[in-house]
Amino acid sequence: MFFLSTGVFGCMSLAASCFERDGRRQHDIARLWARSALWFAGAPFTVIGRENLLPVAVYTSNHTSFMDTPLVFSSLPFQFRILAKQSLWKWPFIGWHLNRSGQIPVDEDGSAGLNRAIRALKAGMPLFIFPEGGRTKDGQMQTFMRGPAYIAIRARIPLVPMALIGTFELLPIHTHHFRPRPVKLVIGRPIDPSGYSIRQADELTARLRDEILDLYTRHAGPGDLIPSLATAPEEQLLESTEDQ
């Protein structure tokens, strides 16, 4: 049923893309798909920290599972753009949806995608990015890339750290079988990048990483794996060899 609903909502989204240019209807359809995905997976969700939401920001979170994306779409009450590795645009159906809904690809160089992301922010469109670039294989927090910090500094737009809790236990990367359980998204306080220069992107990345780990640790419940922290930002801006 999960894969059937994904196909149905995907077809609806592609059809909607023929009648709009801003992707708003497609985003609404994606949100319906996301909530149905969590329901089929047996994963009631909770959102903590809604008071920290901003109209325009660079939203970021840890990345532990394929179910992270449904949780983010179900939890954020507004349209946003996703930055993801360009290789996803080569996938049949998924790539078509990403392209038609206005999501932003980032290649190995990263500059074109990052510049497009900055323009989207300045036009009033929030962004969402997984700073780890790909899903964790063991539940541990991976090294963060500096792309989100770079974008926030360039655009002078706040970073909002978020922790996704329970999705790794719900559907780890090495299985296709759901393990029904509650999940939650915790939204942290915005980080103002105005005191940082581009040369301090690594410093801001480290702060972002610390904030997400702190949110996760403080709100994790029984049975939730507590991740450790990688030591340094990646040289790459966003690209990763791991699957989203």
Identify what each model region corresponds to.
Residues S61, L83-K85, D107-E108, P131, ...:
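Thr-Gly-centered strand-to-loop micro-motif
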Residues M1-T46, F93-R100:
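A transmembrane-helix-recognition feature enriched in membrane-embedded lipid enzymes
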Residues A43, Q103, R156-I157:
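Short glycine/serine/threonine/alanine-rich loop segments
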Residues S111-Q244:
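Non-catalytic C-terminal accessory region of glycerolipid acyltransferases
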Residues F40-G42, P77, G95-L98, R154, ...:
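Short, well-ordered coil/turn elements that cap or connect secondary structure elements
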Residues A30-F80, A84:
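Conserved H-X4-D acyltransferase segment
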Residues F66-R116, L121:
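Membrane-embedded segments
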